[in-house]
């Protein structure tokens, strides 16, 4: 699938970001029984031409504690298998109920989660003759990474992750290898594919907030904490 057929991140704005967040929250609410809608009809009623383009996206859920948050689920799609509006709906439901790291989201948690939608560009494999040159081909604060080895090993980290944990490029590569279930230095293996992508982040300021933040990965603040539950 060509890049032209995908939603480009520069096509998205605050209003569309609000719609994407609403799709995610309404999809979860419907699954919980808080809303009672026909999800297929609901999505069909959203006729924006940009949302009808195929797209790539991740939905992240965080539990809100007032001054801090903790990860509650994160699932996404890096294959353009459906329109962006459907991808966000599917990713939201999967993040809430199918992330193997967490139990399914409960009704009692629904009003206390922050929803974040990251829309991605198409991943591109990084081609280098010398694997030690890989860190120079990556920009922390701009790129996300995918590590693939055969059909059994795959790991992805979003562009905001290395910013949150103050990583340099080599650490970012190593952590993505670990996410794929491989050794930290797997990126030096010529048989391991390394892909990069970019993204734009739409995030609720607070749970169920009307105010949506548009965040560039480079604007994400370092938490200076050990990585947890990625």
From Swiss-Prot:
Entry superkingdom: Archaea
Gene3D superfamilies referenced in this protein's UniProt entry, alphabetically: Hypothetical protein ph0010, domain 1, Hypothetical protein ph0010, domain 2
Cysteine-cysteine disulfides: none
PROSITE patterns xrefs: AMMECR1
Residues covered by the AMMECR1 domain: 15-213
SUPFAM superfamilies in the record: AMMECR1-like (SSF143447)
NCBIfam families registered for this protein in UniProt: AmmeMemoSam_A, TIGR00296 family protein
Protein name according to UniProt: Protein STK_02290
Annotated organism of origin: Sulfurisphaera tokodaii (strain DSM 16993 / JCM 10545 / NBRC 100140 / 7)
